[in-house]
Regions:
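Glycine-rich P-loop/Walker A and Walker A-like loops and their local beta1-loop-alpha1 context
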Residues: 1-25
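Short, charged, surface-exposed secondary-structure boundary motifs
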Residues: 42, 143-153, 204-206
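P-loop/Walker-type NTP enzyme "switch/lid" segment
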Residues: 5-10, 31-111
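Conserved beta-strand segments of the P-loop GTPase G domain that flank and frequently precede/overlap
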Residues: 6-8, 33-34, 113-116, 134-140, ...
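Inter-motif core of Ras-like GTPase G domains
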Residues: 120-141
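Glycine-rich phosphate-binding loop used to anchor ATP phosphates in small-molecule kinases
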Residues: 104-124
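Beta-strand-loop-alpha "switch" segments that mediate conformational coupling across diverse proteins
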Residues: 168-222
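NTP-binding/hydrolysis catalytic cores, primarily Walker-type P-loop NTPases
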Residues: 206-250
Length: 250
């Protein structure tokens, strides 16, 4: 099981759904965790008698809402620490609990867990600094930028992060401004950024998908699809974008 963090203040729900869809097309089992304050997943995906925290399966993807950490999800799913009996009972109690917690999380029945985080607390609660990959997703309105930077200040140790940037015209000065705002953060930006269009046409497709309860990538613009497939390929760390593209169309 590999954790993948998606950090930022802008709406990332649809992006995570599409990335998860691309990963499942490659025969991977995926859990999408909505740890955000607004918990928009509650209102986007259909659920029967939803409780304060719950997990649902939708379009071959599992989605969780309302959990405070991955350990809570483990308890919800009945995942146990299979190696707990092998741990020295004389060990420090705190270390014992941490080892047990880590082992439980490792036993989650997924290839990838995509975690949507919009607060500094979420970084700590979900152990984002230990994630296999991390992405910072933002638009260039001042709220998303500055709130996003506040979230990044929750990172306590140097951490490699890939920028995922929504913008109409991809102006260089926008990305330079983000670099300026984040200069005191612990982030180490990866050399390659992902650029996603934010066109009226793409927004209409996303809204239509939500109305009909579908996760369809095909109708999105070619540029948006390429961004999704690039992220999926980066997470998979294997194969090629063309292979993912073919799997999505099947």
């Amino acid at each position: 099981m590999e954790k993948v963090g998606f950090l930022g203040a802008c709406d990332k729900n649809s992006l995570l759904m599409y990335v998860a869809k691309a990963l499942t097309a490659m025969q991977k089992k995926v859990l999408v965790v909505d740890s955000t304050i607004e918990q928009k997943t509650r209102y986007i995906l259909p659920a029967i008698n939803p409780t304060k925290s719950y997990l649902i399966e939708f379009d071959k993807i599992d989605f969780s809402v309302g959990f405070h950490n991955l350990e809570d999800i483990c308890e919800y799913l009945g995942v146990k620490d299979k190696s707990f009996s092998q741990i020295n009972e004389a060990a420090n109690e705190g270390i014992l609990k941490q080892v047990q917690s880590n082992n439980m999380v490792e036993n989650l029945p997924y290839d990838f867990v995509l975690i949507n985080v919009d607060s500094p607390e979420g970084i700590e609660d979900f152990g984002i600094e230990d994630a296999y990959r991390n992405y910072f997703v933002t638009t260039f309105d001042m709220y998303s930028l500055k709130k996003g930077i506040d979230i990044l200040f929750g990172i306590q140790n140097p951490l490699k992060v890939t920028k995922v940037l929504y913008n109409f015209d991809m102006k260089n000065e926008n990305e330079e401004y983000l670099d300026y705002l984040s200069v005191d953060c612990k982030t180490i930006w990866n050399d390659t950024s992902v650029y996603l269009p934010r066109t009226v046409e793409d927004e209409e497709v996303i809204e239509e998908n939500q109305r009909v309860f579908k996760i369809r990538i095909k109708k999105l613009s070619a540029e948006y699809q390429e961004g999704i497939m690039y992220i999926a390929q980066d997470i998979l760390n294997e194969g090629s974008i063309s292979k993912i593209r073919k799997s999505i169309k099947e």
